[in-house]
């Protein structure tokens, strides 16, 4: 019977060892599962945070693109309007009464005549310019109106043609619009 007691002791010892190993295994498995859950939560949280950040960035890009498109459309509309005003102004200048043309030329010549020795004008304004100034008439220009003054040796030309004045106003207006829209 001594052998049965020894076998029983060995079985009880083995059973206790199996229970201990099983308990350690369960504890380790539970620990690994908990760690995996924590890693999963952190990964999910990081993924959600990244997705939110990406969504916010995309939202900002869409808003910026929309604002830029609105500015571009606005600039184009204003440019179209300036183009129309430019064409209308040219037509108004061309159809201006002779008395008004003479008055404008007289104002330009009274202010700037001393700066030149020769004067150029459009063919339409030639007779008026010759009447208003004692400067040497040097010829005709392809312009809608106004004059160009030139010094004695031809090195300096002052352009007071309406074409030039309109072009300068037009370009300044475009620059102002662009500055307003794009800072």
Curated annotation (Swiss-Prot):
GO cellular component, one term: proton-transporting two-sector ATPase complex, catalytic domain
Primary residence: membrane
Alphabetized Pfam families for the sequence: vATP-synt_E (PF01991)
Keywords assigned by UniProt, alphabetized: ATP synthesis, Cell membrane, Hydrogen ion transport, Ion transport, Membrane, Transport
Keyword set includes Phosphoprotein: no
GO BP, sorted A to Z: proton motive force-driven plasma membrane ATP synthesis
Taxonomy, superkingdom: Archaea
Membrane topology, as annotated: Peripheral membrane protein
A Gene Ontology molecular function term of the record: proton-transporting ATP synthase activity, rotational mechanism
Annotated InterPro entries: ATPase_E_C, ATPase_V1_Esu
Compartments it resides in: Cell membrane
Family (UniProt): Belongs to the V-ATPase E subunit family.
HAMAP family assigned: ATP_synth_E_arch (MF_00311)
NCBIfam families: PRK02292.1 (NF002629)
Role noted for this protein: Component of the A-type ATP synthase that produces ATP from ADP in the presence of a proton gradient across the membrane.
UniProt subunit comment: Has multiple subunits with at least A(3), B(3), C, D, E, F, H, I and proteolipid K(x).
The protein, known as: A-type ATP synthase subunit E
Protein source organism: Methanosarcina barkeri (strain Fusaro / DSM 804)
């Amino acid at each position: 019977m001594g052998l049965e007691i020894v076998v029983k002791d060995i079985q009880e010892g083995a059973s206790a060892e199996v229970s201990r190993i099983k308990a350690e295994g369960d504890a380790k498995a539970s620990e690994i599962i908990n760690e995996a859950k924590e890693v999963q939560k952190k990964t999910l949280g990081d993924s959600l945070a990244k997705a939110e950040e990406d969504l916010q960035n995309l939202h900002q890009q869409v808003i910026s693109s929309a604002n830029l498109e609105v500015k571009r459309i606005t600039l184009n509309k204003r440019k179209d309007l300036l183009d129309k005003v430019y064409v209308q102004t040219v037509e108004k200048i061309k159809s201006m009464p002779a008395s008004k043309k003479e008055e404008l030329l007289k104002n330009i010549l009274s202010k700037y005549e001393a700066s030149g020795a020769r004067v150029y004008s459009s063919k339409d304004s030639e007779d008026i310019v010759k009447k208003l100034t004692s400067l040497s008439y040097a010829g005709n220009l392809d312009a809608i109106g106004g004059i160009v003054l030139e010094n004695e040796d031809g090195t300096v030309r002052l352009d007071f043609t309406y074409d030039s004045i309109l072009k300068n106003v037009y370009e300044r207006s475009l620059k102002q619009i662009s500055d307003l829209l794009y800072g």
